[in-house]
């Protein structure tokens, strides 16, 4: 497993991350398939969108279908018929999202099973075991994603627990002789001192890549990108930087300018299910009445299946009003492709040293305003 930075434009980078199941060109956007499926579409349709890697969730796959079923198929790739790389969240996000159903200890986390209500116990070692059997190309350490806002004292204690869990994850990952990649997750809330503490200790332990966690949980964009900028300056240049859970198009561009290489988010698929379709000229809210008789495709120059087969805005509006599953599928295909086209254009702009021009054109079209004057980074 190798990561190489191939070109830079300011702090933005184009890189190549080589995994067992394929090569990922970065910056890369990762569609979310929490339960081993990107909602509404097939694995082939995800691949046709240009996606290079999928994110799935360790915790939920452990509960359903369970490891025994996945072992029958050998790994998660064969289970979901996706032959590209897979990254799996360790279960740490569920420490945040299921906060009313869990109890944190230094040993691990007790959860109430959201399916049947039974008590289950997840530890760093167990998370590494599960991800090993899933066959994840990129494994994430077990951590706590802290809610926002939280006190300095709470986050400081959480960082220490997560550092302990990261070290245990590293030791058990190595004990399994897992030949895939192990990424650490830098926590610390909105406090630079705690982010620095987390990052420096994780760098000392040594990991294949570093994720920036604990963001997009309610903080302002200004706070978010202040932390992203700060942490990217600490992560070693030769390691991939992964910003978790952030995915608005303008946020991706800003983070790329700050030096981020990878992203995941549910926005393209969730918004598709709610009739929000992304284009180079802004968002089309397909359920609006003005599209009832609109014969145009979602976007004239889009090369996705939905636009190329000329499914009209009028038809998609009708499907949305009728709550037809075909509409969700066609919307999702378009949004997934939009995100991959955006990343392709970003990578090409970096290669040509024209990222500033690309960003200025994007901001003009979207009437988008920088939160931190990030153009100074390119």
Curated annotation (Swiss-Prot):
Alphabetical list of SUPFAM superfamilies matching this protein: tRNA-guanine transglycosylase
Keywords attached to this entry: Glycosyltransferase, Metal-binding, Queuosine biosynthesis, Transferase, tRNA processing, Zinc
EC number(s) per entry: 2.4.2.29
One GO cellular component term noted in the UniProt record for this chain: cytosol
Note accompanying the cofactor annotation: Binds 1 zinc ion per subunit.
Region described as RNA binding: 245-251, 269-273
GO biological process per UniProt: queuosine biosynthetic process; tRNA wobble guanine modification; tRNA-guanine transglycosylation
Binding of substrate, residues: 89-93, 143, 187, 214
Residues involved in Zn(2+) binding: 302, 304, 307, 334
Catalyzed reaction equations: 7-aminomethyl-7-carbaguanine + guanosine(34) in tRNA = 7-aminomethyl-7-carbaguanosine(34) in tRNA + guanine
Metabolic or biological pathway: tRNA modification; tRNA-queuosine biosynthesis
General function of this protein: Catalyzes the base-exchange of a guanine (G) residue with the queuine precursor 7-aminomethyl-7-deazaguanine (PreQ1) at position 34 (anticodon wobble position) in tRNAs with GU(N) anticodons (tRNA-Asp, -Asn, -His and -Tyr). Catalysis occurs through a double-displacement mechanism. The nucleophile active site attacks the C1' of nucleotide 34 to detach the guanine base from the RNA, forming a covalent enzyme-RNA intermediate. The proton acceptor active site deprotonates the incoming PreQ1, allowing a nucleophilic attack on the C1' of the ribose to form the product.
The name this protein goes by in its record: Queuine tRNA-ribosyltransferase
Organism: Blochmanniella floridana
This protein's encoding gene: tgt
